[in-house]
């Protein structure tokens, strides 16, 4: 047996092990790079991140009117309610409601009282995502429906002056987004 054969015979397993580990390491690096690219592309784009939070000037919203803005691709109703609307919302017995949850991202797990659905203690400002919770249609407002609030013409859901479902197929109240007053005339959504 030649010296080369002896040397190969002594270290054959070591060379084989090295090639095995080198190939496995290269495969792991390649798989990690592919996984990183796949996960990274799922992050929101810059334009989506820019829309994640918006500021809305409500200085021109008169009592009894509403402003609709687009946020995250959905309409958001910002209503400045009248004293009659506030009183009508506060007189409702929770036992009459289909959905007894406030559906308020600012107050999770709160009951659907009028106070838990408005932005201020006086109940003047009501901010809701303007999407019917039945099949995603946009309800009409300004006193529409049988309860003086909003009405979804697609399938007949009626919402009261607090945006709570009162009649129809919608299973939940209109949802309230994360929102806060930055000052007396600016609301931040998101």
UniProtKB/Swiss-Prot annotation:
Q: How does it assemble?
A: The main subunits of complex b-c1 are: cytochrome b, cytochrome c1 and the Rieske protein.
Q: Which NCBIfam families match?
A: Rieske_proteo, TAT_signal_seq
Q: What further note is attached to this protein's record?
A: The Rieske protein is a high potential 2Fe-2S protein.
Regions crossing the membrane:
18-39
The organism sits in which domain of life? Bacteria
* Protein's organism: Paracoccus denitrificans
Q: What is its EC number?
A: 7.1.1.8
Name-wise, this protein is Ubiquinol-cytochrome c reductase iron-sulfur subunit
